Swiss-Prot record:
Fe(2+) binds at residues 181, 262. This is Coproporphyrin III ferrochelatase 2. It comes from Bacillus cereus (strain ATCC 14579 / DSM 31 / CCUG 7414 / JCM 2152 / NBRC 15305 / NCIMB 9373 / NCTC 2599 / NRRL B-3711). InterPro entries: Ferrochelatase, Ferrochelatase_AS, Ferrochelatase_C, Ferrochelatase_N. The lineage of its organism: Bacteria, Bacillati, Bacillota, Bacilli, Bacillales. Its EC number is 4.99.1.9. Gene3D superfamilies: 3.40.50.1400. Fe-coproporphyrin III binds at residues 13, 30, 46-47, 54, 125. Involved in coproporphyrin-dependent heme b biosynthesis. Catalyzes the insertion of ferrous iron into coproporphyrin III to form Fe-coproporphyrin III. The gene is cpfC2. PROSITE patterns: FERROCHELATASE.
Length: 319
């Protein structure tokens, strides 16, 4: 029996693969407006501080291909083909959709490598893919909109936190800060669920890890005139120290799924500068990256969508 072909569109933010690519990447983020020399040098300096370039590009590719392999092992009746689509670097989301069209893919499942839904993130990615696919007569795209409460995602972070706490002597003097990328405050007034979803993720992980001292914070805010969601994790660290005298800070950037600039610089450098100033200890559990536990998590999420599509098709065919 011939296997049914299904596209697996894995979308992510993207990152420059060399320092020479930083300007084009930054310009794309700024909707075609080149950054000032000062802003460009600042960003390049951050990349240099983490070793020259972010590991994100390599990790994202590994996540996408391992997920595809896992799906092909789970569903022997389907043949999944991986298409990587990035927001700000090649291969762009549009490149992936056009390639699926050329390859004759008629049905696709899309997943964004970000757990929390926002109009700025997951919706924007899926809208770009679906809009172009409709324009060119490409595949029908079934989108996964969010997975912030996926049990295997929660258990991954709970296990990491439990492991981290084995390194801490005075656990009563430790606090966990769950964080995600800050976004403009205006999304809250518009009813965006992003903030509440992060809170829910934090509550679920805290319960699973059996921790009492935890809170949420925001990081990596953009440099724009509009106010962004706070508190920033660095300010939050200082406030928590002053109010509670915590001696150990465990940073869990659960809004991200891989090591990249925002984690390796904004957390591992900037937050550690703050904890060092406070004479407190800095901890940051391992990011999911392409670890088998996280790939299993992603495969579970996509598998649920496959079964949802199959059930929907059965209902339609029986009517």
């Amino acid at each position: 029996m011939k296997k049914k072909k299904i596209g697996l569109l894995v979308m992510a933010y993207g990152t420059p693969e060399s320092l020479d690519d930083v300007e084009a990447y930054y310009t794309h983020i700024r909707h075609g407006r080149k950054p000032s020399e000062e802003a460009l040098e600042d960003l390049i300096g951050r990349y240099k501080a983490i070793g020259g370039i972010s590991p994100l590009a390599k990790i994202t590719k590994e996540q996408a291909h391992k997920l595809t392999d896992s799906m092909n092992n789970i569903f022997t009746e389907y043949e999944f083909t991986c298409y990587l689509g990035l927001k700000h670097t090649a291969p762009f989301i549009e490149d992936a959709v056009e390639e699926m069209k050329r390859n004759g893919i008629e049905q696709t499942i899309s997943i964004v490598l970000a757990p929390h839904y926002s109009t700025f993130s997951i919706k924007a990615y899926n809208d770009r893919a679906i809009r172009l696919s409709k324009e060119i007569g490409g595949p029908v795209i079934e989108s996964i909109e969010q997975w912030y409460d996926e049990p295997k995602f929660i258990s991954y972070w709970a296990d990491q936190i439990k492991e981290t706490f084995t390194e801490i002597d005075d656990k009563e003097k430790a606090v966990v800060i769950f964080s995600a990328h800050s976004l403009p405050e205006k999304i809250i007034a518009a009813g965006d669920p992003y903030v509440e979803q992060l809170k829910h993720t934090a509550d679920l992980i805290a319960e699973a890890a059996n921790i009492q001292n935890y809170t949420i914070g925001w990081q990596s805010a953009g440099n724009t005139p509009d106010p962004w969601i706070g508190p920033d994790v660095q300010d939050l660290t200082k406030d928590l120290y002053e109010e509670h005298g915590y001696e150990s800070f465990i940073y869990c950037p659960v809004g991200f799924v891989a090591e990249h600039l925002e984690v390796l610089y904004d957390n591992d450098y900037e937050c550690k500068v703050v904890t060092d100033e406070l004479n407190a200890k800095y901890f940051r559990p391992n990011m999911p990256n392409a670890q088998s536990a996280f790939i299993d998590c992603l495969a579970e999420i996509v598998s649920k969508k496959v079964k949802e599509i199959v059930d929907k098709d059965l209902v339609l065919n029986n009517n």
